[in-house]
Amino acid sequence: MNIFIGGAWPYANGSLHLGHVAALLPGDVMARYFRAKGENVLYVSGSDCHGTPISIRAKNENVSPQEIAEQYHKEFKYCFEELGFSYDYYSRTDDAYHKEEVQRIIKLLYENEFIYEKEVEQLYCADCNQFLPDRFVEGICPVCKNIARGDQCDVCSTILDPLDLHHRKCKICGSEPEIKNGNQLFFKLSKFQEMLQNHLEDSKKKWRVNALNNTERYLKEGLQDRAISRDLNWGIEIPIKGYEEKRVYVWIDAVLGYYTVSKKWGIERNRDWETFWSKEAIHYFIHGKDNIPFHSLIFPALLNGIGYKKMPDRIISSEYITLEGKKISTSNNWAVWVPDMIERYNVDSIRYFLLANGPEKRDADFSWREFINSNNGELLGAYGNLVNRTFVFVKKYFNNTIPVGKLEEEIERATEKLYDEVGKSIESGNLRLALEQIFQFIRSINKYFDEETPWTTVNTNIDDCSNTIYNCLFSIINIANLLNPFLPSSSAKIKEWMGCKEASWNKLSLSSGIQLGDFNILFERLDKKLAEEELAKLGR
């Protein structure tokens, strides 16, 4: 089976925070899981290096947009690598090949009469002497009455036009813009209404509820044609006569990246990329809820406009992460920055918390106290404790060698069942449930260790003791295998310590007589005082 997994492309206009990672982590879990199952996987993403957020930051810092994009693209790559993201290709939207492909697609859509010219009212700032693209405008959302940008409201996720906003202001100088007429290019999104409606009906059990509800809302309102050109000097030039000075709307540019990077990957690796874009391939898209309409409506319409009938099979769209009960605010430094966190904490501790408490169905909160409790409780107290006390026992009483033992039927059946249950949970995007299923098993094996009292039977019945430890070691190697999609770093350590090189999504066997490698503590205890230190940094 060919499985394509696309992770949303973060704007390269500032450091990643935990909200970004929480939305994107499910993609890595799925990629690792499907590879272990032996499926043919292509997992891609990249940095969104165009658009107004980058232009605004560059203007504020008196540098070029290219410098800003370069700085944060490098930082993103480093952070994703440190966090264990296993992208097959991580690209960028200012890549030359991507630019050529996007321009080719725009031309093709124009030739196919899915793009047309239209005179529209636009906002113009007399003080700045320029037309204002969407993100250069701020105002009040007409739907929920909160402060919003000119392209979308972060609170209610409504896609907006700058003219929709009340009490509009120029983001650059703060003055009130005036309305002027100008020509723009529009994509005939309305032409795809019926096709997208039919696909929504087919996706009722495959997309997350927020994706279904959000997409259904737009379809009920009736799809509106969307402007794809912007009055900017940073971005991909429109390849149509009379519009060469305008740039491609950043969200058209970004979602087409899934397609263009697949082609580039195929060319560079001499691989058949088109198998991942056939109707038979399975597509997963991983992103936050604010990105839903771009993936559920705009991207499939663009693909159909150039002859690809592939539709999104699974949309794994996360709700938001709050921080200490409040909305994340990058401007007020009410955020946990990923570059800082990966320098201070175990990456598997970060991954575990964000996956075990992920915003799958509703907003979730990141609390420093809960993060420390999570590390010290589940990871250290349950998982790490099982591994450490079993390994220490083997070293002390069995010369660091896996003893002879008979696998107990109950443990074997529970393990086989776990692979099936966890696999189903992952494939449906229920990662919180998948992790809980594994940790229930961990707790049951800890209970088994306690009830079998090997510290007593080592002196009274060595065969019973050997059997207990053998079953614990069998459980540990399979737990590590099951947790590999979630916690790849700690799983790799355990497999190395136990001399295991298998990576399939099947029950692993355990051979007696193998010597354990040098091992150490899997997870360190975190001092609760760290929570106070981290809290003191917020909002400063």
Swiss-Prot record:
Molecular function GO terms recorded: ATP binding; metal ion binding; methionine-tRNA ligase activity
Record-level GO cellular component terms: cytosol
UniProt xrefs under PROSITE patterns: AA_TRNA_LIGASE_I
Catalytically driven reaction(s): tRNA(Met) + L-methionine + ATP = L-methionyl-tRNA(Met) + AMP + diphosphate
Keyword Nucleotide-binding tagged: yes
Note describing how the cofactor binds: Binds 1 zinc ion per subunit.
Entry-linked PANTHER family: METHIONINE--TRNA LIGASE, METHIONINE--TRNA LIGASE, CYTOPLASMIC
Name recorded for this polypeptide: Methionine--tRNA ligase 1
Originating organism: Alkaliphilus oremlandii (strain OhILAs)
Gene (UniProt): metG1
